[in-house]
Amino acid sequence: MSAADKDPDKHSADADPPLTVELLADLQAGLLDDATAARIRSRVRSDPQAQQILRALNRVRRDVAAMGADPAWGPAARPAVVDSISAALRSARPNSSPGAAHAARPHVHPVRMIAGAAGLCAVATAIGVGAVVDAPPPAPSAPTTAQHITVSKPAPVIPLSRPQVLDLLHHTPDYGPPGGPLGDPSRRTSCLSGLGYPASTPVLGAQPIDIDARPAVLLVIPADTPDKLAVFAVAPHCSAADTGLLASTVVPRA
C-alpha cells in the first residue's frame, strides 16, 4: 500500500490539479462539477496568487461586457482580437515541466502575472476599434497636470457587519425593486454560475446595498464548509457572462 493510500488527505491534495488560469476560468464560468468547484474555491481562499488571477479574469469579463453593451464601440471583435485575448490568458500561465501533474501548484511569477493582466486590459480596450487604429491620435486639449494623475483606490469591502449579515438569514431575500433582474430565478441561477456555484445553491439572504456609490445586491449563500457563509456584492444585472462582482467575504455562522 502506498503512502498516498495510507493518508487520504495527502492523496486528495496530490490529486488536485494546479490552479492554472484555465482551471480558474472554468470555475468562474461554472463548468466544474460541484465537488471539484468546492475544493477549488477552498484552495483559492488561501492562495493570494489564485485570487489575483480571478480578479484579473473578472475585470476582463466586466470590461468586455461593458464594451459589448456600449453603442459607442464598433462592431464585434475580429477573430485576431479574440486570439490575442486567448494568448494573453495563456501568457499568465507559468511554464511547467512534463509529468508534473501531481506536483504542487507551479509558481506564478508576480511580474509575469501583472504583465498578463495588463495585457488583457489592453486587448479588451482594443475590441471594436480595429478599424480606426490607423487614424491619427487627437492632440491633447491641455497640458498634462496633476489633476490627470490617478491613484489606486483600496479594494471595496462588504459594508455590513457579521451580525447584520446573519440577520439577513431570518428575512425573505430582497433582490431589489419588483421586476429587477435577480428577482428572476433563472437569472439568479445564471449569476450563481458566474460566481462558480451550481444552480442548486440556495440563496440564504439578500439585500440591495451601495458600495462606493455603486448599486449592488448582497447575496448570502452557503460557503464550502457548513460553519461558514459566503457573502458576495454583485451588480443588479449579475449573470454568468458578467457578475459585476464588487466585493466578497466569508463569515462564520456562529
UniProtKB/Swiss-Prot annotation:
Residues 134-254 are extracellular. The chain crosses the membrane at residues 113-133. GO terms for cellular component: plasma membrane. It is a single-pass membrane protein. Its main location: membrane. Residues 1-112 are cytoplasmic. Probably cleaved within the membrane by Rip1 near the cytoplasmic membrane interface. It comes from the Bacteria. Keywords: Cell membrane, Membrane, Transcription, Transcription regulation, Transmembrane, Transmembrane helix. It is found in: Cell membrane. The cytosolic domain interacts with sigma factor SigM. Interacts with ECF RNA polymerase sigma factor SigM; this should inhibit the interaction of SigM with the RNA polymerase catalytic core. An anti-sigma factor for extracytoplasmic function (ECF) sigma factor SigM. ECF sigma factors are held in an inactive form by an anti-sigma factor until released by regulated intramembrane proteolysis (RIP). RIP occurs when an extracytoplasmic signal triggers a concerted proteolytic cascade to transmit information and elicit cellular responses. This is Anti-sigma-M factor RsmA. It comes from Mycobacterium tuberculosis (strain ATCC 35801 / TMC 107 / Erdman). The lineage of its organism: Bacteria, Bacillati, Actinomycetota, Actinomycetes, Mycobacteriales.
